[in-house]
């Protein structure tokens, strides 16, 4: 999305439909290469389970399982980079017959979230055959992506608007000052 639409922060390693490119640690290294001498700023790879296992098949023999929360597991390789493994639908694109697997390499402070507490109100409804209580609650959150600005004029964006690349503008002049990189594996549509 925001990261992937920038040519200097996205490495597309996908192949044609007949010869898909399997995710590998070497491919992830090509993604971190986009940061040049600041490659060590990429501290975390976010990927789905299938992509992680493809990398495991390749060379991830000495990983340590740090912890697991529900279906999200956090692992670490010998270089100290963390692998957050979760089957996030946005990391896989099957549009038009493609089978593209995206991996995000993120820096420290790549994302910032601030939430407000849940405010709940209850009101009794009287004078009817049965008693009722109407409850209403709301909360909000603020999200920031390092080196990017969300489109002006969009108030209370939906999930679809937040994941639309056109709604994000990169304000950092160098890729090294952004949230990170995207590496794409798999195959393009025919």
State where each predicted segment sits.
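Sequence/fold signature of self-assembling virion shell proteins
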Residues: 12-25, 29-30, 50, 54-190
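Hydrophobic alpha-helical segments involved in membrane association or supramolecular assembly
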Residues: 41-43, 48, 135
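Short, glycine/acidic-rich hinge or "gate" loops at secondary-structure transitions
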Residues: 1-5
């Amino acid at each position: 999305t925001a990261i992937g639409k920038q040519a200097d922060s996205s490495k597309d390693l996908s192949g044609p439909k007949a010869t898909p490119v399997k995710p590998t640690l070497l491919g992830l290294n090509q993604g971190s290469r986009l940061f040049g001498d600041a490659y060590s700023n990429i501290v975390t790879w976010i990927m789905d389970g299938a992509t992680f296992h493809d990398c495991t098949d390749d060379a991830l023999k000495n990983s340590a399982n740090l912890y697991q929360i529900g279906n999200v597991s956090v692992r670490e390789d010998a270089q100290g980079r963390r692998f957050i493994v979760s089957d996030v639908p946005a990391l896989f694109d099957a549009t038009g017959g493609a089978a593209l697997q995206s991996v995000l390499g993120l820096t420290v402070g790549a994302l910032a979230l601030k939430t407000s507490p849940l405010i709940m109100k209850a009101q009794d409804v009287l004078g009817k055959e049965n008693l009722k209580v109407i409850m209403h609650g709301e909360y909000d959150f603020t999200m920031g992506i390092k080196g990017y600005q969300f489109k002006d004029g969009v108030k209370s964006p939906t999930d679809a608007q937040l994941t639309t690349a056109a709604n994000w503008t990169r304000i950092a002049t160098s890729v090294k000052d952004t949230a990170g990189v995207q590496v794409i594996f798999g195959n393009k549509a025919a």
